[in-house]
């Protein structure tokens, strides 16, 4: 009876596998029938995250990607060319599979790119923002940007964070442990002497809200702390205890607004 049970399980698995494989196989056979020996073209895949949500995925070459809130990653179903090209709008953490023969290139907004062979790094490049940042955890990357229509490359070492301002066309490098920049993929928010504006930007992405700072004097405040799966109100209460900050939810006159607005005063 044990062999019969194993045989039944195998047959059920085979049926499921056949169901999964059937459509791709049918498409391949049709392409071969109509297109002779022409190879099937790689499809462009796109993964999007909703506000306040995160996801992870594995690319065809084995590269692991964590995608942050309101982000989009586009990539081919196969890396057939000499380079592995993906396009990012938003924020992602990459653990790139090593392949010395094929560079891994991340295209971002403002005609900039990040070029790697095999490494771990974080990229923040939201289309609506003028700022792009890259934090290198392991390996080596090159940040490529255009200045007066000339391509320039900045090489980075582990423990460095690059910030590119597309308005001023300036690049700055900072030393960092990377702890704060990549905490989001573990569901954490880490502030390390983080300025108020930067901290609020992090909270906007995580909780799908919009902050309005009414008191400019508060912009000089900075905060240190670690939060794991905390309610937004709990974090704002911590801000309130640590400084003179006060906050309140605003009623939106536009019912189409998807984001709650919070005034900092």
Model region roles, listed by residue range:
Residues 2-265:
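A residue-level detector for the "anchor" residue at the start of short, highly conserved motifs
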